[in-house]
Structures are given as structure tokens and as C-alpha cells.
């Protein structure tokens, strides 16, 4: 792929990484001179209806959204040889997972500022009828200027579709952030994303995920049955107000969680202003 030009415009420069479905390349937009990321469906899936549909679904979901805290879709296309690609913003930086692995628990005020931006992105997605379904630190990017961007809407679904989590599209890394409804393959809605945001917030505040286990099934069962240890018991710097936000987001039953990303966003901001008030 190196040096190949897609659509007469996007010149592939180097590899950025790969997943089970697609490879991601750094490319230069010959029209503007700027660098972009190009996500290319693997060649072996060009004629696979399931993977083509999933790739198209990502494009459909991404096309609904334009937000400073989302990795935005710039272009989409199919080459004459069947090569399918998405052109997205190139983010020069690290994933949130890398930050946590390098630093351990983040300062609560920094973690809160990051989660505020994640929630702004999630709120925008939900307002546009998109449920992400795979919120995790690996899908949250932080660029060199400190801008937070949510990426990878590859398993997102339009909210009015029959949205279940029974697809075998997830990876082991996702199960640590699964909502209980995802863990049992039930229908999911916007509140499932909020649970996952809560799990990410938990990890930022404590340096560890809410639940661990030797197998994905063992971890999933804990999401379903075991209450999480309050973050403040692991990191005493976590305020009562932030404890409340995280544990409210991690309620087992969707009806007991925040009603919306906006509600959770409000409480995170209040927790920063009044850390000892619940």
C-alpha cells in the first residue's frame, strides 16, 4: 500500500496500525498537503457481506457527526479493485490507555477534564442517533495539544435499530468496559455507553479497571453481579462527589444510571466545584 494513491488524492505514507477488520494508514492529502488517516478494509473481506456491512455502518455513523471531540470522517470511497476506505482525521498523540499505562492513576481533576470531553462527544453522538457501543481508553485519543477525541465507531449502531451486543465483533480489551446488558447480549441503548464511560473514568481515577478475571466470561459475570469497589478506597484523592458520579454511572440496571450524557456531564462539573457534596 505504501505510495499508493487512493481517489487520485490520498497518498499512503506509512502504517499506523491494524485491527481484525481493517488496516489504518497515514496518508497525505495531495490537494491540501495535510496528513490524514485512511482506514482500509482488509482485502480478504472485500466480498464478505458481514464485514462490508460493518464498514459501511461505521461510515454511516461517522457521517452523522462533526464534533471537536470526535475523530471526524473526511471522505469515503471504493476503488475499482474493490478497496474500501474511510478517510478520517489524523491525530498525532497517544491513546488514553497508553497514558494510564505510563502514569497509573491520573490526578482526579485531570481525569474529570478528560471525561468531560468524552461525555461531550458521547452526547453529540447520542443526539445524532448513534450509540458507540465500544467506549474504552484504547478508543480515546489525546493529541499533542491535549485535545481529547473519541474514535472507532466501527461497531456503532443507529439508535433506532435493533441494537444488541451479540455480534462477535468485540475484542478481549472491550470486556473490561462492557455494560451488564452487553455482557449478557441484551438490547443496549445510550445508557450502555454511559456505563462504559463510567468504567473508563474509574480506570483513570484508580489506575485499574472496575473488574478483572481470567476469562471474558468471568469479567462479564462481575459486571452483572458484583458491585465495584468505590474509587476512593483505591485512591483516597478521589472526592465523595466523584465517587458518586462513577458509581452512579456503573449501576447494574440501566434505569438506575444517568438518564443522559448531559446529566452525567453536569454532575462531573458540579463534582469539580463542590468535591465534598453528593
What are these language model-derived features?
Residues 13-19, 24:
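Protein kinase glycine-rich loop
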Residues 118-130:
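Protein kinase catalytic-loop region centered on the HRD/HxD motif
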Residues 49, 144-187, 214:
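Activation segment of protein kinases
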Residues 174-277:
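C-terminal lobe helix-coil module of Hanks-type protein kinase domains
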Residues 114-115:
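Activation segment signature within eukaryotic-like protein kinase domains
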Residues 81-95, 99, 103:
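Conserved short submotifs of the Hanks-type protein kinase catalytic core
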Residues 76-77:
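Activation-segment/catalytic-loop signature of the eukaryotic protein kinase fold
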Residues 42-64:
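AlphaC helix of the eukaryotic protein kinase fold
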Amino acid at each position: 500500500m505504501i505510495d499508493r494513491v487512493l481517489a487520485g488524492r490520498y497518498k499512503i505514507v506509512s502504517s499506523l496500525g491494524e485491527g481484525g477488520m481493517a488496516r489504518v494508514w497515514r496518508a497525505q492529502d495531495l490537494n491540501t498537503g495535510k496528513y490524514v488517516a485512511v482506514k482500509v478494509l482488509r482485502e480478504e473481506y472485500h466480498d464478505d457481506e458481514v464485514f462490508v456491512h460493518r464498514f459501511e455502518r461505521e461510515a454511516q455513523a461517522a457521517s452523522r457527526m462533526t464534533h471537536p471531540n470526535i475523530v471526524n470522517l473526511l471522505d469515503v470511497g471504493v476503488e475499482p479493485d474493490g478497496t474500501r476506505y474511510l478517510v478520517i482525521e489524523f491525530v498525532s498523540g497517544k491513546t488514553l490507555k497508553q497514558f494510564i499505562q505510563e502514569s497509573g492513576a491520573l490526578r482526579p481533576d485531570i481525569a474529570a477534564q478528560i471525561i468531560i470531553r468524552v461525555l461531550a462527544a458521547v452526547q453529540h453522538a447520542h443526539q445524532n442517533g448513534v450509540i458507540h457501543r465500544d467506549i474504552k481508553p484504547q478508543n480515546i485519543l489525546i493529541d499533542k495539544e491535549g485535545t481529547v477525541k473519541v474514535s472507532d465507531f466501527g461497531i456503532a449502531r443507529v439508535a433506532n435499530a435493533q441494537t444488541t451486543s451479540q455480534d462477535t465483533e468485540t475484542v478481549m480489551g472491550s470486556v473490561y468496559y462492557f455494560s451488564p446488558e452487553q455482557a449478557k447480549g441484551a438490547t443496549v441503548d445510550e445508557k450502555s455507553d454511559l456505563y462504559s464511560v463510567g468504567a473508563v473514568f474509574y480506570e483513570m481515577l484508580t489506575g485499574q479497571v472496575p473488574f478483572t478475571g481470567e476469562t471474558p466470561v468471568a469479567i462479564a459475570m462481575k459486571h452483572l453481579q458484583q458491585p465495584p469497589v468505590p474509587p476512593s478506597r483505591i485512591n483516597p484523592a478521589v472526592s465523595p462527589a466523584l465517587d458518586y458520579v462513577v458509581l452512579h454511572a456503573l449501576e447494574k440496571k440501566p434505569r438506575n444510571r444517568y438518564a443522559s450524557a448531559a446529566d452525567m456531564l453536569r454532575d462531573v462539573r458540579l463534582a469539580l466545584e463542590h468535591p465534598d457534596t453528593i
